[in-house]
Amino acid sequence: MSRISHITLDDSGLPPPTPEIEQERKVAMFDLLEDNTFVLPPREGRPVPEGPYHVSLAIRDKRLVFDVNTETAEKAAEFHLSLGPFRQVVKDYFQICESYFDAVKKLPPSQIETIDMARRGIHNEGSRVLQERLEGKADIDIDTARRLFTLICVLHFGG
């Protein structure tokens, strides 16, 4: 099974993230590299270079760009996704994360748990949208989708 062995975020020109966003980014990147599934299907009947892959994520011209190379720097794929389908779920995710970060500081565990469940639900929705948008471009499992969605949110935060 193919996977991502290295990931970078092109956040040049974006404002610095908050400490909470930076922590989310670090955790998502670590977890992603520990365990992920990322398979590129053949394109137009031609095979694609096999992984593991180095993936760079960027937002360019209001599009999410996946730049995928092999470990030997051979171009494997590049695809651009419209950010439109992600806008509402990213906005909802940031709002619930803000509530969660505030709750952790001052609310009892039962209320934190309720907010966390809502946060996970929105995160799952964003992951599902990502899997749909990548259909035919890359096959990823739900855990990989969740971690990549977190990184997309980090890029959105600055953009």
Curated annotation (Swiss-Prot):
InterPro entries: UCP032146 (IPR008321)
Pfam families assigned: UPF0262
Similarity field: Belongs to the UPF0262 family.
NCBIfam families associated with the record: PRK02853.1
Name of protein: UPF0262 protein RD1_1069
